[in-house]
Design a protein with these regions (language model features):
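Active-site clefts of carbohydrate-active enzymes
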Residues: 278, 454-476
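Glycan-association/targeting regions that enable binding to alpha-glucans and other polysaccharides
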Residues: 1-54, 58
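Extended extracellular/luminal ectodomain segments enriched in beta-structured repeat modules
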Residues: 14-17, 112, 603-605
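Short boundary motifs at domain starts and secondary-structure transition points
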Residues: 55-60, 271, 449-451, 598-600
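Structural recognition of the beta-strand scaffold that forms the well-ordered cores
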Residues: 21, 65-70, 120-126, 143-146, ...
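Active-site-proximal helices and loops of the catalytic beta/alpha 8
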Residues: 39-40, 162, 166, 180, ...
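Acidic glycine-/aspartate-rich tracts in secreted/extracellular proteins
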Residues: 26-27, 73-75, 573-574
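Substrate-binding/active-site clefts of carbohydrate-active enzymes
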Residues: 58-64, 72-303, 320-352, 358-432
Length: 625
């Protein structure tokens, strides 16, 4: 024993070890570490003695602002793990710009840049092991329980990134997926392949994918390597979804995947069908599947992840999430762990085609109908049937709940009532889709707010890695319009989020994502690292010193300076973070004008805000302004 209940063991003459721990009969995931000194405590690795590390103080997420990066496209900290995707040649991505380029080392190196801009949380794309022709974004999982080796370096593991961010007061928001895996199977749900490679660069070829000997897949398709690509894809789905297209045997006997063949975007099949070729729909209503996914994702929470962004949330029934997933993650995460989901509704209205069951506000509520509370059983088929009934019960806007949690009572702040909340939030897609200009987005947000449990938790942005407000391109409205949009995001209710590079209007007007049909450098997912070369030291959120090289110029760009100012203002005014608001003409008159107030203990913060144009404020309480 060494120190406070620690045991020490030295492995001589090795550069890497793989190990597992068994505690009270429960086996950990396989753990891999390279040469060095490591501690393991409470399911977390550390390169420093945990007893010497200060626990990260996780605050209410509304106090934060979020900077969103595609990890592989942000900054290249270690050229040794750069690797092409299998389809890079089709996309014409050159050796100088492989799809897998940025990494955890790059994020660690540029934490001071993100903090200098003023952001206190970083949303990163999925970290789990992927497999597909174009998987640099992380949404095509092959193993939910492990981190993809293409992100990591010696001294820059995922744990190292989390710890380094926390040391600077920055949260890590992990993008996660439960709706689907990639189509090369999944290590637990459909084990068909393993990756064999001597160096990271070997992963640039599909030849690294080796059929697992003795697997059902190997026995069913012994000639897999001889099939043409179309039949290879059909063979993989035959095993995963039991399609019986190439073989009539029963393969997915545990029903780990949904077997539905049809999908319509505005019907219940949007939650049971396969949304894309590389997104094979997982049977989230199967308790065995839920147990596996919860164990995998709870392990990341135990590493110190501060929040989850749930991908493709609309494609999973709210009932399933409320029953199987949200309670588990919130319990593991503890105080101030935050979850927000992507309810992708590509319409300007807040009720998606007038169907609440696939609309953003709907996903912020707990179940209120007794027939759906604690209703799932071990029968996955019965659970699926219940989700279909749940969808039909919420297929019209009649009788949808409303809330005044985001509104002031006159000019008084009141304690929000979260008794009907499911404890999670969403990306404000209706607001996002209306950012053709700030006024439209602001108006839509005001119209939709009663239907969220509390819209002050909504994550708000102008554009992202998938869409701009016009659907296809990165925002191109000009610097002044960008500034006005940001003024709304940083002062109105919600948690502001900025997609990497927008501080420079990076790649403005170019197509956001075209798959492997053009070089990434011509899209909204281009590599940003050239603008980050040099050094900077963040002295606080939104302030810095010793900036040099390209990063100094980036931080001095007009929009970047504006963002720094907005972040400093928002951090200084609690009402702009967590306040309720009013637009009542008893107190305020103006196009985009409002009053926000937050009262808690000794804090009483009130802000009068006008975005652009004239405004008048009246009947305000006496105080120092």
């Amino acid at each position: 024993s060494e120190g406070n209940n620690y045991y020490k063991y030295t492995f001589n003459d090795v550069t890497k070890i793989n190990m597992m721990f068994v505690t009270n009969g429960k086996q950990s995931a396989e753990l891999t570490r390279n040469t060095g000194e490591w501690w393991y405590k409470n399911k977390r690795w550390s390169s420093k003695n945990p007893e010497d590390m200060q626990e990260f103080d996780r605050v209410d997420m509304r106090e934060d602002t979020i900077y969103f990066v595609i990890t592989t496209r942000f900054y290249d900290g270690d050229t040794g793990n750069n690797v092409h995707c299998w389809d890079d040649s089709q996309a014409n991505n050159p050796d100088s710009d492989p799809a897998w380029r940025g990494d955890f080392k790059g994020l660690i190196d540029k934490l001071d840049y993100i903090k200098a801009l003023g952001f206190s949380a970083i949303w990163i794309t999925p970290v789990v092991t992927n497999a597909s022709g174009y998987d640099y974004h992380g949404y095509h999982a092959m193993d939910f329980s492990t981190v993809d080796v293409r992100y990591e370096s010696d001294g820059a593991t995922y744990q190292d990134l989390i710890d380094a961010a926390h040391e600077k007061g920055i949260k890590i928001v992990q993008d996660i997926v439960v709706n689907h895996s990639g189509n090369f199977g999944e290590a637990t749900l459909a084990p068909m392949f393993k990756k064999e490679y001597d160096s990271i660069q070997d992963l640039a070829s599909v030849d690294c994918m080796k059929v697992i000997e003795g697997s059902d897949f190997a026995k069913t398709f012994p000639n897999y390597d001889e099939l043409d690509p179309g039949d290879q894809y059909a063979a993989r789905l035959n095993i995963m979804k039991d399609t019986k297209e190439l073989d009539s045997g029963n393969h997915d006997t545990e029903n780990y995947y949904h077997h539905f063949k049809d999908l319509s975007w505005e019907s219940p099949t949007v939650q049971t069908g396969q949304i894309a070729g590389d997104c094979v729909d997982i049977n989230t209503e199967n308790p065995k599947v839920a147990d596996y996914l919860n164990e995998a994702y709870n392990n990341y929470i135990n590493m110190g992840v501060d929040a989850f962004r749930l991908d493709t949330e609309k494609h999973v029934s709210r009932l399933t999430l409320n029953q199987y997933f949200f309670p588990s993650w919130l319990k593991t995460g503890g105080k101030n762990f935050f979850i927000f989901g992507e309810v992708c509704t590509r319409v300007s209205e807040f009720w998606n085609h007038n169907i609440p069951a696939i609309s953003a506000p709907f996903y912020t509520w707990a179940e209120s109908d007794s027939q759906y509370i604690d209703s799932f059983t071990n029968d996955q088929a019965a659970n699926i049937d219940l989700t279909l009934k749940h969808y039909d019960s919420n297929a019209t806007t009649a009788n949808q709940p409303t809330s005044d949690n985001v509104y002031l009572d006159g000019l008084k702040y009141h304690t929000p009532d979260y008794s009907k909340s499911n404890g999670t939030s969403v990306i404000d897609f209706p607001m996002h889709w209306n950012f053709s200009n700030a006024s439209n987005a602001f108006t839509r947000a005001c119209q939709e707010d009663p239907y969220y449990n509390d819209a002050s938790w909504n994550v708000t942005y102008v554009d992202s890695h998938d869409y701009g407000p016009d659907m296809n391109s990165r925002y191109d409205g000009g610097t002044q319009a960008w500034a006005e949009n940001l003024d709304v995001l940083f002062t109105f209710r919600g948690i502001p989020c900025l997609y990497y590079g927008s501080e420079l209007e990076f790649q403005k007007g170019v197509p956001m994502d075209v798959g492997p049909n053009a070089p990434l450098s011509t899209t909204g997912r281009a590599y940003f690292g050239d603008y980050l070369e040099g050094d900077v030291t963040a002295t606080d959120f939104g302030t810095y010193t010793n900036a040099s090289g390209a990063v100094a110029s980036t931080l001095e760009a007009p929009l970047a300076v504006h963002i720094q100012q907005l972040n400093r203002i928002r951090r200084a005014v609690p009402a702009l973070q967590k306040g309720q608001y009013t637009r009542s003409n008893t107190y305020v008159d103006g196009n985009m004008a409002f009053i926000r107030r937050y009262t808690q203990g000794a804090t009483d913060s009130l802000a009068c805000v006008t975005i652009s144009g004239g405004a008048t404020f009246q009947n305000l309480p006496n105080g120092k302004y």
